[in-house]
Amino acid sequence: AEIDFSGIPEDIIKEIKETNAKPPA
């Protein structure tokens, strides 16, 4: 599923992507 990043600041997008890249605890 794609996430709609429209209207979201670049730094927030980066933070979300980095969080998604981490394996679940």
From Swiss-Prot:
User: GO MF terms on file?
Assistant: toxin activity
Main location per the UniProt record: secreted
Family assignment?
Belongs to the non-disulfide-bridged peptide (NDBP) superfamily.
- Residues annotated as carrying Phosphoserine in the record are S6
Biased composition of type Basic and acidic residues is found at 11-25
Keyword Magnesium applies: no
Superkingdom of the source? Eukaryota
Disulfide-bonded cysteine pairs: these are: none
From the UniProt entry, list the residue stretches annotated as the region Disordered. Answer: 1-25
Extra facts:
The primary structure of this cryptide TyPep-8 is identical to that of cryptide Pep-7 from Tityus obscurus (AC P0DRF2).
Mind listing the UniProt keywords for this protein, alphabetically?
A: Bradykinin receptor impairing toxin, G-protein coupled receptor impairing toxin, Hypotensive agent, Phosphoprotein, Secreted, Toxin
Q: Write down what this protein is called.
A: Hypotensin-2
Residues annotated as site: Important for potentiating BK effects: P23, P24
What GO terms describe the biological role, i.e. biological process, of this protein? regulation of blood pressure
Q: In which tissues is it expressed?
A: Expressed by the venom gland.
Protein localization? Secreted
Q: Does the keyword Phosphoprotein apply?
A: yes
- Gene Ontology CC annotation, any one: extracellular region
